């Protein structure tokens, strides 16, 4: 009999800082009429890092929701929604050096210019 190790949370138990697999669950209530979640298969979601917070936001202004992610020892990570497939976006030079110990992320139009701004906190 073989035992499979199940990982949960943001790290592999006993192996900090090795991150566990990240995944996105889709609520299938509209399609099924029942409370059921399905795992969304996407290679860019699997090895993000030790995710601690995320938010849905139209980062690129194309009228669909992208995913913005932060975590322990992670840079700000943007998963751009391209036809309901989330693609990890290459960050601009000013955002590439955002690696930190992030635990919170909020999106809001702080300067009143009509687009969302992001606040990351540790």
Language model features: what each stretch is:
Residues 1-122:
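Beta-propeller-forming repeat regions
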């Amino acid at each position: 009999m073989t035992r499979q190790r199940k990982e949960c949370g943001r790290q592999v138990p006993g192996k900090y800082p090795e991150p566990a697999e990240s995944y996105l669950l889709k609520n299938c209530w509209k399609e099924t009429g029942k409370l059921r979640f399905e795992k969304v298969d996407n290679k860019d979601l699997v090895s993000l890092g030790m995710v601690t917070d995320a938010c849905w936001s139209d980062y690129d202004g194309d009228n669909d929701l992208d995913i913005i992610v932060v975590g322990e020892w992670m840079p700000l990570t943007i998963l751009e929604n391209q036809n309901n497939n989330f693609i990890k976006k290459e960050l601009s030079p000013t955002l590439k050096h955002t690696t930190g110990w992030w635990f919170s992320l909020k999106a809001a139009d702080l300067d009143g210019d009509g687009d969302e701004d992001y606040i990351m906190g540790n």
